[in-house]
């Protein structure tokens, strides 16, 4: 039996496309050619799929909230070292869960898992070269001392020669970088640089000191540190800080597997569908690290809700909770007086189509048996026998 024949048999079935393809591949792999057996397998798969589909009118939102919220009460409140990488501090537990559903623009501990391609992933020295190209190098990171010299009225930088060599930089590279960022007169004396300004004063020199320290020399901005770790048969880089777009441009990086824990950044670089997958993955990993198991479909429900408008929105008064169509539903969530006052001024009408607003006014909700209308047959009304 060919793939085209199987696709024709399955094209009008209730099975989703991914399941159809997987089923077709499995039938071909097992080399099942008898048509009656293939038909029986398809029918059994459809029956099994139908049993897993949720009943119409089921309160899936409440079930998802309970299923995520209840294990959430058992999660740790602390931030501690990530089990896999002892050198990196990563937010885990409840604080991380809150970060995800709040769609924070910047996580408290941004980090990246950078996978390598080709020969880079099997050779530690090659992986170290990539890590050096990624790790952000500033003037401070290649200096032994940066201070204000009151006697000579200048900023003195004592460069660390070993650090410069290990990062493949020269004193001239540092001088050029400083000149491109600041208007200063620079005097060189081997590894000591004296930075002078036109009108020197203690206040002016101290004001420039932090800027001099942060001047970028090499690598990807925002990536403070990169560590190399052996994962089964390949080397993987873990970074402190995140910059997905620029890391993708580094030679040797596998762009198909590299990821970050910054969901908003994933949306900006790879789009909303990738952000949805990241929300599911991050929530699942956060719960999994605590030894908690939640059905993925509950997490998918939350991710779908957060990304349904094409951008990642938080679950709260500044996102989904504050954008509900119903005035009463918005008022019931947070900022009650503000919503009621605003609605009465503008003359809004609530059509009571949701759950919360119907509960407020004491009407049956449109869920479960409440979403079914009972009709009387015409024959029964006319007194005819049924």
UniProtKB/Swiss-Prot annotation:
Reaction catalyzed: RNA(n) + a ribonucleoside 5'-triphosphate = RNA(n+1) + diphosphate
Q: What is any one of the record's Gene Ontology cellular component terms?
A: DNA-directed RNA polymerase complex
General function of this protein? DNA-dependent RNA polymerase (RNAP) catalyzes the transcription of DNA into RNA using the four ribonucleoside triphosphates as substrates. Forms part of the jaw domain.
What is the annotated localization of this protein?
Cytoplasm
Chief localization class? cytoplasm
Q: Which gene encodes it?
A: rpo1C
Enzyme group, top EC level?
A: transferase
Query: What EC number(s) has UniProt assigned to this enzyme?
Result: 2.7.7.6
A GO molecular-function term, please? DNA-directed RNA polymerase activity
| Family to which this protein belongs | Belongs to the RNA polymerase beta' chain family.
Q: So which residues are the signal peptide here? A: none
This chain's protein is named DNA-directed RNA polymerase subunit Rpo1C
Q: Which organism is it from?
A: Methanococcus vannielii (strain ATCC 35089 / DSM 1224 / JCM 13029 / OCM 148 / SB)
Q: Which UniProt keywords apply?
A: Cytoplasm, DNA-binding, DNA-directed RNA polymerase, Nucleotidyltransferase, Transcription, Transferase
GO terms in the biological process aspect are: DNA-templated transcription
Give the quaternary structure: Part of the RNA polymerase complex.
